[in-house]
């Protein structure tokens, strides 16, 4: 953002939302002009106030990442169908890869989360979801592959004891979105800046969602692909999601 300010004269006042919902409200209440979300949260912002897709970050030629469900190697669980009667930890209900896509995979496997899972733990984050598994509090856990691989590298997860149970299809990298009410000339200037900033600065300064190093930003990522990914969540309706959250509240 500092580089874009210096080169293109577009100034930013960066603020961290207290929650996924707060980040959406900030854009839709016109307290923010640009937001950076997961795909699901972007979908909410688009539905509520017509947030426009600005860009997704690209790493090693890929503009997607993956969600996963994990379990211990001695759990006896070898397929998603075998989660029936087991316990599952997930992240925040608005999280694309630690809640929404994992439950979409569970539903696709014929499992009704609220009825068929013994217990659901809403851990609140990828890290906490993984911790619930490694500490033996649940049979399986959901988190992004990035979070899982980071936990393995840090020694939090012992790969000799835990395994990937299921991996999602590619999920669009967390998109940058713009308030639709911005002036057209400013929108064009912002798009140009994000599309070519990687050619103007040292590559180590190009950062993606969460601060990871990326190659560039793709400002021409098709909206149809973003919406297509969100369509895969169609079975996870508001009713089903409500039942899951209610189940998680049971003691």
Segments (PLM) and residue ranges:
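Extracytoplasmic
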Residues: 9, 29, 37, 49, ...
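Extracytoplasmic/secreted proteins, especially bacterial periplasmic and envelope-associated proteins
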Residues: 3, 22, 26, 40, ...
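Pocket-lining segment of extracytoplasmic ligand-binding domains
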Residues: 75, 84-185
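Surface-exposed patches in mature extracellular/periplasmic domains of secreted proteins
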Residues: 12-17, 120, 203-206
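Hydrophobic/proline-rich hinge and linker segments of small-molecule sensing/allosteric domains
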Residues: 55-79, 176-179
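Beta->alpha turn/N-cap motifs
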Residues: 16-20, 30-49, 57, 142-152
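An extracytoplasmic/periplasmic, membrane-proximal ligand-sensing/linker region
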Residues: 171, 177-251
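Short, polar/charged alpha-helical segment
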Residues: 1-11
């Amino acid at each position: 953002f500092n580089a874009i300010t210096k080169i293109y004269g577009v100034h930013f006042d960066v603020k961290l939302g207290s929650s996924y919902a707060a980040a959406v409200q900030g854009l839709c209440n016109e307290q923010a002009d640009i937001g950076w979300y997961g795909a699901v949260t972007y979908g909410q912002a688009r539905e509520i106030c017509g947030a426009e897709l600005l860009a997704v970050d690209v790493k090693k030629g890929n503009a997607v990442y993956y969600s996963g469900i994990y379990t211990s190697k001695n759990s006896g669980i070898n397929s998603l169908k075998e989660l029936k009667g087991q316990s599952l930890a997930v992240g925040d209900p608005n999280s694309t890869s630690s809640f929404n896509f994992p439950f979409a995979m569970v539903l696709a496997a014929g499992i009704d989360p609220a009825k068929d899972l013994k217990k659901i733990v809403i851990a609140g984050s990828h890290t906490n979801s993984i911790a619930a598994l490694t500490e033996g509090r649940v049979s399986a856990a959901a988190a992004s592959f990035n979070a899982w691989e980071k936990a393995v590298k840090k020694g939090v997860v012992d790969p000799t004891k835990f395994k990937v149970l299921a991996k999602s299809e590619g999920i669009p990298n967390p998109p940058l979105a713009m308030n639709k009410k911005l002036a057209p000339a400013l929108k064009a200037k912002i798009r140009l800046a994000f599309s070519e900033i990687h050619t103007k600065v040292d590559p180590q300064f190009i950062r993606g969602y969460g601060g990871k190093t990326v190659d560039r930003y793709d400002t021409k990522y098709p909206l149809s692909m973003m919406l297509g990914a969100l369509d895969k969540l169609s079975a996870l309706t508001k009713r089903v999601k409500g039942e899951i959250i209610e189940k998680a509240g049971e003691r």
